[in-house]
Amino acid sequence: QAHGAEYKGRRAGSMGDMGCFSFYPGKNLGAAGEGGMVTTANPEFARTIRMLRDWGAEKKYHHVLKGYNFRLEGIQGAVLRVKLRHLEKWTEARRAAAKRYDHLLIGSGVGLPKQMDYSRHVYHIYAIRTPHRQAWMDALGAQDIQSGIHYPIPVHLLPAFADLGYQAGQFPHAERAANEVLSLPMFPELT
């Protein structure tokens, strides 16, 4: 969801040992179905990733790892190739919509996304923070404006991570964010 984002002059996906991108249809660069990409400059990591995505096979019928079927279908690649040509235009439209939101919401008492001088936000989501989230949702809904709650449960409280033994109250900032974050509509065609 950070396709085209930058931090101190470096693009997302080029920092660290590996980068990961989702091509879920709702993302800034979305396929027609499921898909994703891993980036790396490390040849050994790239070799391992290629094997893991193809049932662990180094070459056909020669499986050296326990892998999965994570190959991107050709039609998905074709869709992405066409959409990639438009990504920068769509990103700038999202950034313009975010500026409009900033202008309209400044002074409203809600927390706004921050755009630092040394980074480039691509606004997959435009999320505000407010302790009055339900009131905002109701007011927006009354105007036929959709809003959404992304990630309503902090990771440490998800059943999948119960074995780690974390309890409510141990990560108060994450818990507060889960209760306050509200996503406003964000897409390139937003007017």
Regions found by a protein language model. Name each.
Residues 1, 24, 34, 50-54, ...:
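Histidine-centered beta-alpha loop that forms part of the nucleotide-sugar donor binding/catalytic region
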Residues 1-22, 29, 154:
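Conserved PLP phosphate-binding loop immediately N-terminal to the Schiff-base lysine helix
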Residues 6, 41-191:
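PLP-dependent aminotransferase class I/II
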Residues 11-15, 38, 165-168:
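Short, hinge-like loop/turn segments at secondary-structure boundaries
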Residues 15, 34, 126:
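Acidic, glycine-centered active-site loop in nucleotide-sugar glycosyltransferases
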Residues 24-26, 187:
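Residue-level recognition of the GNAT/N-acetyltransferase active site
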Residues 28, 32-37:
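Glycine-rich phosphate-binding loop of ATP-grasp-fold ATP-dependent ligases
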